[in-house]
Regions:
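Distinct, well-ordered alpha-helical segments
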Residues: 193-201, 258, 301
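Chitinase-like catalytic core of GlcNAc-active glycosidases
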Residues: 179-188, 205, 217-310
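SH3/SH3-like beta-barrel fold
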Residues: 126, 138-143, 151
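Boundary/entry segment of secreted carbohydrate-active catalytic domains
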Residues: 106-108, 147, 152-199
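Short, solvent-exposed loop/turn elements at domain surfaces
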Residues: 109-112, 140, 191-198, 218-222
Length: 310
């Protein structure tokens, strides 16, 4: 297992844990993989070769969340190798150039470059090592069984350079692009009557091809929002060749954006209801205008955007 903080910061930013509702989530292009705390690896249908594996996908101990390497490796383009005695895990890039050499004689791998440095492990003549870095008299190497340390350069021979390619299949996260420059205006809509002003306002606008009416606004901490959406407004805009991106804001001071986005239940409600509202009136897109976000909201906002994009 690896700490969640390490996984999300160094290996795969899409691994997300909702510590309030005890869920691990992973957003794929067409769905969100979900595992409650204690869920066995074998119960996650998106994982392969996990039959009979009852170990949990993730757990929390002493305030730290840990995620199964099996789960992480399934979604991450990295090489993971386990070794025993002592137990250790070696993580490396799946592709790239690697320098390798053969050990000429029995020697020691040392913690630092120097004969007085602590011995990490012994290596025998003929063993293969990967060269990680080279100095004048010593080189940093990784042994076949995953130890990293330094050996003298005169104990190395037959250096080769090998190009490795990854067989990892990255999910395709698609996005919408336009083959023209977007000229967008916002339409401040305070009441449903303001929607009737679209035609007259467009008479004064030149070169505009996208309009974002301020229709949606968070109304409580449960993921609900007010709506001034109007199907006829969208139809009028489309007749004039404009796309309509409905705007949602977080300007209500009685609403905590953190409370809404940090819980999967409320975030899901917001995503589902907002998507349905967009479909109901034929919107071309959604303009998320969440402002004054604090650092603690950041990861949850990113997850919200991931889920909204599914």
């Amino acid at each position: 297992y690896l700490s969640y903080s390490y996984v999300s910061s160094s290996l795969n930013k899409k691994v997300y844990i909702d510590e309030r509702e005890r869920l691990l989530l992973y957003a794929l292009p067409d769905r969100v993989v979900q595992a409650a705390e204690g869920t066995a690896l074998s119960d996650v249908t998106d994982l392969e070769n996990t039959e009979g594996k009852t170990a949990p996908v993730w757990y929390e101990q002493d305030g730290t969340c840990y995620v199964s390497v099996t789960f992480v490796s399934h979604f991450t383009d990295q090489s993971f190798q386990f070794f025993e005695a002592p137990g250790r895990l070696y993580i490396d890039d799946s592709e790239g150039t690697r320098r390798q050499a053969q050990i000429l004689e029995d020697t020691q791998v040392r913690r630092l470059g120097g004969i007085k440095s602590e011995i990490v492990t012994d290596v025998t003549a003929g063993a293969q090592v990967e060269i990680l870095d080279s100095m004048d008299e010593w080189s940093q190497v990784r042994t076949e069984n995953g130890f990293i340390g330094y050996v003298r350069n005169d104990t190395l021979s037959g250096e080769t350079v090998t190009e490795y390619t990854s067989d990892f299949v990255e999910p395709e996260y698609t996005s919408l692009t336009k083959d023209y420059d977007i000229c967008l205006v916002w339409h401040q809509v305070f009441s449903s009557d303001d929607n009737n002003d679209l035609s007259s306002l467009l008479e004064e606008a030149r070169g505009v091809n996208t309009i974002a009416p301020t229709w949606f606004s968070l109304s409580d901490n449960e993921g609900n929002f007010t709506s001034l959406a109007d199907t006829s407004y969208v139809e009028t805009a489309h007749e004039r060749g404009l796309e309509v991106w409905g705007l949602i804001d977080n300007f209500n001071k009685d609403v905590s954006t953190y409370e809404v986005l940090s819980r999967t239940s409320t975030r899901t409600a917001l995503v589902e209801n907002l998507t349905q509202a967009a479909l109901d009136c034929g919107l071309d897109g959604i303009n998320v205008d969440f402002e004054s976000l604090t650092a603690d909201v950041g990861p949850h906002f990113v997850q919200f955007i991931r889920e909204l994009s599914v």
